[in-house]
């Protein structure tokens, strides 16, 4: 089967499409239309099926924009001239991502098509990205990257969540006024500088307003590591920056626009004017500090900045900013700073605690602003510093915390509040870790001369299990300090008639046990005597209640851990025990004249002969039968 292809050597008549005639030998012809060569003068006119025949209607709709490149228009390969390249380089230095309107203006100036200008910018951005990637490995060609392109690369790195080398950012990203301006050209190597973007479309300071037409016209970002907020503004052939430290921020909040005519966004109030910088690339090498470039110097007089944008988007971005530790401690002059040259060019050591404390003691957390700060343990509010980055040290649970008991030897209120304005650090005592050993002794007689023993009495241990080796049931070698005035320690404990356990109301099987007689506590602690000096500014201890249930265990049982299975530690080893105490004048107290009820009166047991329980007596009874 033969196939013949007939191709005409020239195009058909104008308006008639040429064809390829294929003879397949099976009486079937296939006609394929061939492209029509347009006249050279008709390159800019792209035929459209929707073009109306009426010329009046054609004037209403603008003609479709040409997508031809300069080579397609001239039908030959052509390179850009030196003047065209110079103009393109200058425009790229100002803004690497121009809009279609800007590209049309550039194309008219240099006599190129808009499509050719767009392709040149795309190729230039790709070349700069490749150059920046190689510069990370070799450290070369960093100075050849324009400042605007560095900001563009930083924005892309921020949006992707990756770090960006600080060497690309030059002096523009470094905080001024902290000694870093002199170190801008002395960076040993590229370091990661992470910036976060605030999606803002406008900036208003007083009567001066800037509105971003594209991505590079207005960029608002902050650096958590440098603790700076920056507004980058691109105008014509120069870039401008307004920058200030976190410590300059007095207040910051999100404003929702209730009025449709107003724009919502972030409102920032400063406590001092910001710093101003400008960059006239490529004539200058990076940003340099300048005066206030706003209209009538509004930014130096008005300290309220309004960043317009979507409140929903900005609220999430602002929440991330205010949660930063560097932002929360922005007004702390002794805050941790990662740069050793940040404070006057002098090296700063790590924060040192004003008191000598063991390594197992935890760091003192900074109290809430609304609370009074106590300085009775030797910690002054002026010494509260921000913890540096790293692992927070935790106190060992098996080692008791060190407390300066020497301050407690003198009478003092139990609720001692020191106002921040009167904070005075207490002198450190060398005896804080060397208490005087004392021998165990019995409780002193009831009265103001009570001395508290650290050993758990009455066989009741309020501590939770498991316990460490430091809580073994051994006699306490180091007793508590003298909270109250002491009495002779050799005075014996007065005899007491302790009640039987089943006469207590909390163990009674009666349904209405509150009507029973609740015997008064015979504890050696006195609730009717004079209050000791340590609670002279506190509620009187006689108002605290004490029930006879607290005396269920006799004073002779002094073991910290019970050996038998009947103590409350075995019954409620996993729960905290709270025993109520009721004084005679408490509403829960019942008069002694009411009826008494003993457990023996409720349950009667027959008399059992002990000899009848012997196996021998049972065996004899069976044998007798």
Curated annotation (Swiss-Prot):
Residues 467-496 have a biased composition (Polar residues). GO terms for cellular component: nucleus. It comes from Pyricularia oryzae (strain 70-15 / ATCC MYA-4617 / FGSC 8958). One of its GO terms (biological process) is cell differentiation. It is found in: Nucleus. PROSITE patterns: HOMEOBOX_1 (PS00027), HOMEOBOX_2 (PS50071). InterPro entries: HD (IPR001356), Homeobox_CS (IPR017970), Homeobox_DNA-bind_prot (IPR051000), Homeodomain-like_sf (IPR009057). Residues 46-59 have a biased composition (Low complexity). The keyword Ribosomal protein does not apply. Transcriptional regulator; part of the gene cluster that mediates the biosynthesis of pyriculol and pyriculariol, two heptaketides that induce lesion formation upon application on rice leaves but are dispensable for pathogenicity. With TRF1, negatively regulates the expression of the gene cluster and the subsequent pyriculol and pyriculariol production. Pfam families: Homeodomain, PH_TRF2_HOY1. Residues 73-132 bind DNA. This is Pyriculol/pyriculariol biosynthesis cluster transcription factor 1. Disruption phenotype: Leads to increased expression of the pyriculol/pyriculariol biosynthesis cluster highly reducing polyketide synthase PKS19. Residues 1-83, 466-496 are annotated as: Disordered. Transmembrane segments: none annotated. The keyword rRNA processing does not apply. GO terms for molecular function: DNA-binding transcription factor activity, RNA polymerase II-specific; RNA polymerase II cis-regulatory region sequence-specific DNA binding. Keywords: DNA-binding, Homeobox, Nucleus, Transcription, Transcription regulation.
